[in-house]
């Protein structure tokens, strides 16, 4: 096996999955290109804003992709290249892309509402409350972690063992480029909104802005401390998560999506030119140093195969920007397929190194291994290794920031929706609900808690992120499966992914509880492990409650009347 064969297999499977299985889902569920989407029906200039396909795709792709599809396959490579490749391809086509498409489809068919509202409408209010509370806490954790990672990536200074402080040009370059992206995004947003140019002209402008920002960042690095970046990042998130999507979110993600696409294209060219050999075993063992392939492989490789976080983006922000129902497939299913391709490239990258070779070259983190491999590939055609390495590192590092305001916006929406039911009279809310549903209050409380968590140590509960993320996938699949059944659509294709991910998540949480519970009974636990144990138990209880409610609805002999949304016709 070599890199080219892996790449060809991936292109055929992923491309075929989109062309055949994606379109099959479209036909079975029913797409009405003439239907008025929530982006038009509820247009408010803030969250509900119709946008062209390429712009919404840019938002979806930039929000869900980044370091995740790079880190996961490289970490999971301890089990061998074959199980990793199979899970990326099968998971991407039949699990992840289906979940993302179903989440967006259900949201668009229900006035752009989140999965929480779908659960209330078709499963029950208790399930909705539990889901939204979980989503809100999940978003707080992700914002805290990503903000800390970004602050570290942007940190312009480093201390050596002797206490000498020196500047880090690479970090400074990433910081400058990322800040320029924000400034350019505002300018591009004005162009997109007011100039009304041809989409190809807009694309050309975006590419010029992208190149200019990268070049300027390389030549003029910005040096600020980690603590300063922490404060600046949270100020940015506060503004970005309440600003109209046309002002920053849409154009910024549009810009960043091109950076990611260029990186993927360059990597594919590099693989075909260099044809790297595969230095990994096809399969090592089911148990590697105490880590069992089931469920660890399926929790570790989330982005790139199936990730619950994607359902929050699909139903929380992207669905409110869909201009036509026919755009849902390329935006949701298509973005996931692209991310799976990035995950395959990451697998090829780590497989290209012989045992110990990456560490010998000073490549210690997953993004560094990825960047080092791509630089090796492109060096074959004469591109400078150091330049390519820097550019790839810059591209990967810059993407952590792109997810931050999307996650914060989803967290804000989850907090607001927690206090509103489907039958709530918005004109006669009690005072506490008026305060809680205010977008500024809900954003501030979400970000204040995230900031405090980032400062006191989110790392104590971060090991549960993988299980929590996949639990989101389980809940989203359950909600979508029930929605499809209640609206007389064919949703059986969601059952296998739903049951499999349920087994993965509950097994992972159960193993964590057994391990930490055993330690607690014998030697006691540290504060961090105690928090992990508590959160693992709470997550398992939450998952079981919502799963039982959903399965009851799915197995009802007498189906409820068709959906309560304004649609009766299913297109064949």
Predicted regions and their residues:
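Juxtamembrane transmembrane-helix boundary signature
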Residues: 14-41, 60, 90-116, 196, ...
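Membrane-interface helix-loop-helix modules in multi-pass membrane proteins
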Residues: 51-110, 121-125, 142, 147-158, ...
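Loop-to-transmembrane helix boundary motifs in multi-pass membrane proteins
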Residues: 125-140, 334-341, 388, 417-455, ...
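Extracellular/periplasmic helix-exit of transmembrane alpha-helices
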Residues: 271-285, 337-373, 406
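Membrane-interface "cap" regions at the ends of multi-pass membrane proteins
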Residues: 16-70, 257, 321, 570
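Hydrophobic alpha-helical segments and their helix-loop junctions in multi-pass secondary transporters
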Residues: 189-194, 208-231, 239-241, 246, ...
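Extracellular loop-to-transmembrane helix junctions
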Residues: 2-19, 76-107, 116, 175-185, ...
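Membrane-helix boundary/coupling elements in multi-pass transport proteins
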Residues: 67-74, 91-99, 103, 107-111, ...
């Amino acid at each position: 096996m070599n890199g080219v064969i892996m790449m060809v297999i991936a292109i055929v499977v992923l491309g075929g999955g989109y062309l055949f299985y994606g379109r099959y889902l479209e036909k079975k569920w029913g797409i009405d290109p003439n239907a008025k989407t929530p982006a038009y029906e509820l247009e408010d200039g803030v969250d509900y804003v119709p946008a062209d396909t390429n712009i919404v795709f840019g938002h979806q792709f930039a929000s869900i992709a980044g370091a995740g599809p790079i880190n996961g396959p490289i970490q999971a490579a301890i089990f061998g290249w074959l199980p990793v490749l199979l899970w990326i391809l099968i998971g991407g086509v039949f699990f992840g892309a289906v979940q993302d498409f179903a989440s967006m489809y259900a949201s668009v068919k229900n006035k752009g509402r989140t999965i929480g509202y779908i659960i209330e409408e078709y499963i029950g209010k208790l399930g909705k409350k539990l889901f939204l509370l979980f989503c809100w806490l999940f978003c707080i954790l992700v914002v805290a972690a990503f903000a800390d990672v970004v602050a570290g990536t942007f940190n312009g200074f480093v201390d050596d063992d002797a206490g000498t402080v020196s500047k880090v040009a690479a970090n400074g370059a990433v910081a400058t480029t990322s800040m320029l992206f924000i400034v350019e995004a505002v300018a591009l947003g004005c162009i997109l909104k007011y100039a009304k140019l041809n989409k190809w002209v807009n694309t050309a402008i975006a590419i010029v802005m992208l190149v200019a920002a990268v070049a300027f960042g390389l030549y003029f690095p910005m040096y600020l401390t980690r603590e300063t970046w922490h404060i600046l990042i949270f100020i940015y998130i506060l503004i970005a998560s309440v600003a109209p999507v046309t002002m920053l979110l849409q154009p910024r993600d549009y810009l960043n999506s091109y950076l990611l696409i260029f990186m993927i294209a360059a990597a594919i060219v590099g693989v075909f030119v260099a044809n790297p050999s595969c230095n990994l075993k096809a399969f090592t063992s089911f148990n590697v140093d105490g880590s069992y392939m089931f469920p660890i492989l399926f929790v570790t490789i989330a982005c790139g195969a199936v990730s619950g976080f994607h359902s929050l983006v699909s139903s929380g922000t992207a669905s409110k920007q869909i201009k036509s129902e026919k755009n849902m497939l390329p935006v949701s299913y298509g973005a996931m397929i692209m991310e799976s391709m990035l995950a395959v490239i990451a697998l090829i990258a780590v497989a290209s190194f012989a045992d110990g070779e990456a560490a010998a070259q000073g490549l210690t983190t997953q993004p560094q291994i990825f960047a080092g491999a791509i630089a090796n590939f492109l060096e074959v055609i004469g591109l400078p290794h150091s330049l390519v390495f820097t550019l790839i590192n810059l591209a990967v590092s810059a993407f952590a920031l792109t997810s931050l305001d999307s996650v914060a916006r989803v967290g804000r929406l989850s907090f607001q929706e927690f206090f509103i039911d489907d039958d709530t009279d918005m004109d006669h809310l009690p005072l506490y609900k008026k305060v809680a549903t205010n977008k500024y209050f809900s954003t501030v409380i979400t970000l204040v808690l995230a900031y405090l968590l980032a400062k006191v140590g989110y790392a104590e509960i971060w090991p549960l992120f993988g299980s929590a993320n996949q639990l989101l996938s389980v809940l989203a699949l359950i909600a979508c499966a029930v929605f499809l059944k209640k609206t007389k659509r064919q949703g059986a294709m969601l059952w296998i992914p739903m049951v499999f991910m349920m087994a993965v998540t509950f097994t992972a949480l159960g193993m964590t509880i057994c391990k930490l519970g055993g330690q607690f009974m014998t030697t006691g636990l540290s504060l961090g492990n105690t928090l992990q144990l508590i959160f693992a138990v709470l997550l398992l209880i939450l998952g079981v409650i919502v799963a039982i409610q959903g399965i009851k609805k799915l197995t009802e002999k007498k189906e409820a009347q068709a959906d309560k949304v304004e649609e009766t016709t299913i297109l064949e």
